Amino acid sequence: MSNIQNMSLEDIMGERFGRYSKYIIQDRALPDIRDGLKPVQRRILYSMNKDSNTFDKSYRKSAKSVGNIMGNFHPHGDSSIYDAMVRMSQNWKNREILVEMHGNNGSMDGDPPAAMRYTEARLSEIAGYLLQDIEKKTVPFAWNFDDTEKEPTVLPAAFPNLLVNGSTGISAGYATDIPPHNLAEVIDAAVYMIDHPTAKIDKLMEFLPGPDFPTGAIIQGRDEIKKAYETGKGRVVVRSKTEIEKLKGGKEQIVIIEIPYEINKANLVKKIDDVRVNNKVAGIAEVRDESDRDGLRIAIELKKDANTELVLNYLFKYTDLQINYNFNMVAIDNFTPRQVGIVPILSSYIAHRREVILARSRFDKEKAEKRLHIVEGLIRVISILDEVIALIRASENKADAKENLKVSYDFTEEQAEAIVTLQLYRLTNTDVVVLQEEEAELREKIAMLAAIIGDERTMYNLMKKELREVKKKFATPRLSSLEDTAKAIEIDTASLIAEEDTYVSVTKAGYIKRTSPRSFAASTLEEIGKRDDDRLIFVQSAKTTQHLLMFTSLGNVIYRPIHELADIRWKDIGEHLSQTITNFETNEEILYVEVLDQFDDATTYFAVTRLGQIKRVERKEFTPWRTYRSKSVKYAKLKDDTDQIVAVAPIKLDDVVLVSQNGYALRFNIEEVPVVGAKAAGVKAMNLKEDDVLQSGFICNTSSFYLLTQRGSLKRVSIEEILATSRAKRGLQVLRELKNKPHRVFLAGAVAEQGFVGDFFSTEVDVNDQTLLVQSNKGTIYESRLQDLNLSERTSNGSFISDTISDEEVFDAYLQEVVTEDK
């Protein structure tokens, strides 16, 4: 008979993963609400206690303990056991360590612990209180993985360990982050709740005001603590504790003496030093980790004129000197993961301790009653000692003697066993007195235990007494200080930036960089690092305190503070915008670039699209947005994928000239174009024919303009030939239509003259040497000096720039800008 079953993979996967999820939720990653331990932690403590590896004995090799735990209770690999053991020994992770370890058990710098064959471990004294009375049937036991031995499913827990040491873990669909607390405060809250089971959060917080991290630091936000204590979820600010020390020469240094919980100190020091190296905030001279056996100490030495408060606020905001700690208090309660506040945690703990105390009392009472029964028999024996001795001597053996005692004197089986095994020296008069005293003590003990079992008040008084004993023995002062509200960090961004001279360059394809004046001066303009198929469209001297706007052919604008640009040598290629701007397209190009000081002036830009739209938009629309480092924003809306921007530039109240591909030119005043929002569409710029598109647009602030056709014909036309009309008209023809090989506009623009302001590029132009570079389809480069061109009639087709260009046709054309500054 075949055992093969046909089942749905979907059903199998769902059922199996469901089982697996249930296992890791209940038996791996989440703590029990009663003892605050995960299964691996519980097994470590129980196994070490079972092997008498306790605080009052000598240390034992960690490897031996790990082997016993793995072999008997936790068959999941030695590394997971050892890692859990090490964490329980780290006093910067636990408020009260449960394992004491000799040797390297890691560090706050994230150093790994020594291998378990080198370290030694034993239970701490306070861990013994978690296991106290476990031998008295106080907690349920279950079979281990191979049914050879039983292990506890929860520990007796003489103190609320879940709150004292907290917990962190991730399982399937659940995670937990419970912060550690001060032992004395937790016990005070538990004692109060024993007397007041319906206590409110506000009252409990008088005893337990907030977490107490082993690394100290400052916790800010009492309202968030209250919210977390009510719901199990909340967020507080944890800030490092710092001091300001005076140094020689009028300098100061910031000294960090406590850092937030779970922060890697070495990484923190490195991040602070990175701030210094990258000059993110001015004034840091040196960063030193001066921590030693006496405690944590990080020194940040400042320069003489540094703004100490500014530096400290910057480090709080941009490094882990200050973090947000997120409460997510999830624990296993009755086999179910629950998000709990401190009331359910304390209630569950008190209910658990009630069961432990009652079970222990029943165990002790039963044991005392058995002993009392035997003591009563022994006292009775002494009063008839001679008869009993004679009876025993007359018996054949031990069993016969026991039977004779039961028959002749009505002793019970237990009493008869105690009598026949009694040593003769115990029959002295002194021992009789001892037995009588023991009887009285046993009766008193039984009465007390009966009172505990039968009276809730007596039982709870004992619970409070035991908790107070733990507090008295192990209480330590609070390490973390509490503040009512999180202090807002205010940073004047401008004051963070050291003002330096630099040169900014941008290429058409989107490579940007800033270059030091030294590197710039050591090279020629032509030596700029770039791709062979790319070209420089912008280079200008600037200050690191200024801003950079880049307008693209797809209607996007990209913002960069100049100080954030990578400082790269002039001969290196630079950083491509796609490395940081996630929505920068492969076919996107930079059209216009400008350096500016501020965004709140009245500057407006005009933008013209290929499909005939025009708009004006204000500069203030581009005030730096939150995601500027990774995303561009729109400055013009395109109609479809075939549309693109053909012109964008700042403009005042000038006329603008638009030139279409089929040779029409239209001139009108920019006031006809409304100022709209950055995301809004424009208005109709020109009445284009069905097969026509806009090819160029420029500001009418010179006396002439040039026009280049796709066949390589170039001409210069007086601006007066284009009469000003209004927008949305067809315009005037600026080319004569031919039947064969008609000319089509490739590029048009203003010819520079004195007083000219470049409308496409901020690069300064030599008005006496404005050269147009034309590249043919075959790669040949032709140069034409625009100032040398004679004025042509409006309807002429101009002159070819070369005898061969007509057959080759134009592939690319652009003005050669010349930097006049330092070059």
Swiss-Prot record:
Sites annotated Interaction with DNA: K38, H74, H76, R87, K93
Stated name of the protein: DNA topoisomerase 4 subunit A
PANTHER family assigned: DNA GYRASE/TOPOISOMERASE SUBUNIT A, DNA TOPOISOMERASE 4 SUBUNIT A
Glycoprotein is among the record's keywords: no
Gene behind this protein: parC
Activity regulation, short description: Inhibited by quinolones, such as levofloxacin.
Every Topo IIA-type catalytic domain range: 30-496
Residue numbers annotated as active site: Y118
SMART domains: TOP4c
